Amino acid sequence: MVNDTISDMLTRLRNAYLADKEQTSLKATRVVKDIAQVLVQEGFLGPIEQEENGFFTVNLKRGVKQFERVSTPGVRVYANHKQLQPVLNGMGVAVISTSQGIMTDRKARALGIGGEVLCKIW
């Protein structure tokens, strides 16, 4: 049983990229689905496919170099909109959990809201 589903998601994606897979399965939780949708909108992942047996499949796109978990269950990291810095000079994206849902750091800065910094992808 996995306690940290976000770390599990990032590890599955990282391993699939390193193994040159075209798709991988992720645990179907609300947070993981929301993060995957943000990554699809930002162009880091391809379309999300059908959910089955508690898992859903995502198609991978080439070009992703790194996945980094920022806020962990033991050490939560929060930032307001002024503290959110661009990832890799705007080439990457930070995924933020805000009061208005899960979104990118760019969108959170534009809306002037902060939240928990879940992960960074570049």
Swiss-Prot record:
Coiled coil: none annotated. Keywords: Chloroplast, Plastid, Ribonucleoprotein, Ribosomal protein, RNA-binding, rRNA-binding. InterPro entries: Ribosomal_uS8 (IPR000630), Ribosomal_uS8_CS (IPR047863), Ribosomal_uS8_sf (IPR035987). Its main location: plastid. It holds the Pfam family Ribosomal_S8. The keyword rRNA-binding applies. GO terms for cellular component: chloroplast; ribonucleoprotein complex; ribosome. GO terms for molecular function: rRNA binding; structural constituent of ribosome. It is found in: Plastid, Chloroplast. SUPFAM superfamilies: Ribosomal protein S8. One of its GO terms (biological process) is translation. Belongs to the universal ribosomal protein uS8 family. One of the primary rRNA binding proteins, it binds directly to 16S rRNA central domain where it helps coordinate assembly of the platform of the 30S subunit. PANTHER family: 40S RIBOSOMAL PROTEIN S15A. Part of the 30S ribosomal subunit. This is Small ribosomal subunit protein uS8c. It comes from Ostreococcus tauri.
